[in-house]
């Protein structure tokens, strides 16, 4: 009994010494420096400081709008709508998934738009980086290839619609049309073209559905859903004709 009490006291004393040692080491250790961040509004003696601040703010705004610009001013809209039509026509519900469709549409957009982005890099960004042109000139040269691409894919009817809605004077040429007027007209034209391609994609799959439904009715199998039977045949047909290659090549070639 006496040995048990002594062992308990020894354990308690050892724990107290350990706690005191850790506390002493913690006090002796140098405190970690904490970073400080000061945000304030002060007077500036140079007008250029204000200009740089505005430029940074505009740059952050453009970066936050990058997904919207990708959708509005590139081939992304047509591609993602056509791929969605393809999935619906096949009847595969969630295969391929939305993530796969968006990723494929994004990289196809990079592939299609790469000549335009290379032109922007060579004619606008690199000269501006080398301080050969001003920032305003660089912006004008960067917008020009994008405007040319959008105008080449926009119907005159859609363009005339938004020019009339904006109540602007009749433009003499394409350079007189504001970019904010071209963008919605371009998107409407892209949706129209995507729906036309989607209609062509639907036709062979509808034929397969009709044939399967007719066969089931002739066999008296009224209660069996035709979609469940036709799905394997539609997938087989799509694979045999190299459907992915045909759809992707048609999409890329549709942009000329």
Features from the language model and the residues they span:
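N-terminal secretory/membrane targeting signals
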Residues: 1-29
